[in-house]
Each structure stands twice: as structure tokens, then as C-alpha cells.
Amino acid sequence: MDKFDTQEKIMDLVKECAEFYQQGELLEAMACCDEIIKLDPTSVVGYYNQGIMLFEEEHFDLSNHCYDQIIKIDPKHIESWVKKGINLFMLEEYEESIVCFDEAIRIDPKDYLQWVNKGKSLYALQNFSECMTCYDKAIKINDKDANVLFLKSRLLYELGNYEESIQFCDKVICIESKDSHTWLIKGMSLLHLGKYEESIVCFDEIIGFEDVDHYSICGAWNEKGLAHRNLGNYEESIVCFDKVIEIDPNYENAWSNRGNSLRDIEKFEESVLSCDEAIKINPEFAGAWSNKGLSLHSLKKYEEAVSCYDKVIEIDPDFENIWYNKGWALDRLNRKKESQLCFDKVDQLNNEKTVNFVDSITGINSNN
């Protein structure tokens, strides 16, 4: 078969492959790719299509074998570097994925999406500083991509930069006014800033959207409940938490938060039951155990409260106020020595925080 006939046969196989693929007949489509590779081992199209299909079947390692073959043929085949990087990301091999995205960036520094992909891998590695740099690079190239702006707003939120997070949320909303995830981040940022009424406006936006995803609608009702609780609207907060539970009975945070609001209105027994529901869903939920302990404390069931606090300490010894709360419960039981040990632990933890703070300040000053 001469070169012309070979190319013509390859074109026919490419068409057949596409038809099989569209019909969901992946084995037949893969067989077409194998035929293409047999006809021309240097043909990129056979390996490339195979790589895509293997990716969709979640055979990420096998998919990467295809892209490695292409890279041997053409080291500057940017799509293969990108897809290899994505496969490695899916395999949680984040450092290796960054190598691939760096190679794609070297080939085309203005491909902003590869800065985004690199940023996502750095985010997964909790390298937030370099992740932010990547998002900034992407935004410098294209400041109209709502997804990149959202990723930066989310990272700013997680780093506690709430004011700046809101600014980027507003940029996203100017582009995509009904992006529920962005409204949720904006609302939570406002909540952290103590702007509870403004945060409720954001959560109500989400609640008013049609076809909202599960994460956003549950998050909106739950966070709205927290905002109402902070405003002292305890009954309204319970209505919100009930709405979350109606949508998703396994939403553990809503059960625990509901327990808090019930305690606020002195419905301590109901509060305990609500916390128990959260604990059934997640027995390692330290917050729910703590909330249950506080309600039992209010019911003067100090032994049971101590048991709850002990469970919290088992899960998270540094849980906020837990040693203090345990100390007071033990004090009520007239177990003074044990109580004092808890208060000593509070002092120790506070001193450690102070030392860490001083060390960080000293470190900053020494660099000046």
C-alpha cells in the first residue's frame, strides 16, 4: 500500500472511529485506533483518540501511555502534555501533573487555561501562595473567564481574605449573574465579616434560582440559618436548618447547627436529640459532640456532658473551648482536682498560642 492509499485508509478509519464513538461502541472505536497505529505508528490521531476514550473510561494510566507515545513523536504536542497532566491530576499525582502543565506553558505561555490547571494542582498540594500566582497569571491573560475569577475568590475566602474575595465574587457575578457557587462564597465571606443581613441577601439569591445544585441549595439554607442565629433570630434559623434536613436528611452540619439554635431558646432536650442525629451520620463530628455536651451541661447532666467532651478531646484535643467546658462540668461534679487540670490545660494552650504568635512576629522582624 503506497503512502496515498495509507493516508486514505487512515481517514476512513478516523471516520469509522468517530461513528462508533458517537454510538457508544467504544471497543469498536478503539479497534479503529489500533488499525490506524498499525498502518502508521507515527500517526498522532490514533493514539490521541485512544487517549481520550481511555480517559472517559477512567483508565488514566493507559490513557497516559497514549499521550506518552505522541510526545515521543512530537515533543511540542501541547494537547498531549495537557491531557497527560489532567490524567495525573485525576490520579492525585499532583507534582507530576505540574511538570506537564509547565511544559504546556513553555510551549504556549499565553494559554491561560494551563496556568489554571497548574494552579489547581498546587491547590491540591496546599501550596496556596504559588496557586494564587498561577490564578493571577491566568487572569492577567484573560480577565473575563468567570471560572478563573471564581477560583481566586474561593481561594481568597479560604485564606480569610474576605473583603478581597467579595470583590472577585462581584466580578464573577457581573459575567454570570446566576452562578450559585459564587453567591455562596460571597455570602459566607459577608457572614465572616459580621455582615449578616447582607449575607442573607446572597443566600436568598441562590434559593430563588431554578435548578440549583445540591451543594449550593443546602449550603445556602444552612448558611442563612447561621446568619439568622448570629442576628438572634433563633426560630428563623431553625426553619432554615429544617429546610436543609428536608432536602438532605444526612446533612450533618444542619443537625448540629439546629442543636445550637435549640439550645439558644433553651430547648435543651430537643437540642441533644438534634446533635445525636448529626453524630449518627458522622460519629467523628467533634462539633456535634461539643454541642451535645453543652446542652447536657445546661440540663445539669454533668457526667454525660463530660463524656461528650471526652469524645471531642479524643477526636480533636485542640477543639476550641473544650478543656474549659470540661473543666466547668467537672467543677459542678465537685471533682476539683480534675477540673483544675482542665483549666491548667486551657492556660497551657493559651500560652502556646502566645508563644507561636511571638515567634511569628520575631520572624517577621528579623527579616526587616
Model regions: which residues?
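TPR/TPR-like (Sel1-like) alpha-helical repeat modules
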Residues: 324-354
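Canonical positions in the second alpha-helix
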Residues: 36, 69-70, 103-104, 137-138, ...
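Conserved alpha-helical positions within TPR/SEL1-like repeat arrays
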Residues: 14-22, 45-56, 79-90, 113-124, ...
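Thr-biased low-complexity repeat/linker tracts and other Thr-enriched repetitive architectures
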Residues: 99, 167, 197, 201, ...
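TPR-adjacent "capping" and linker segments in tetratricopeptide-repeat scaffold/adaptor proteins
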Residues: 1-13, 210-218
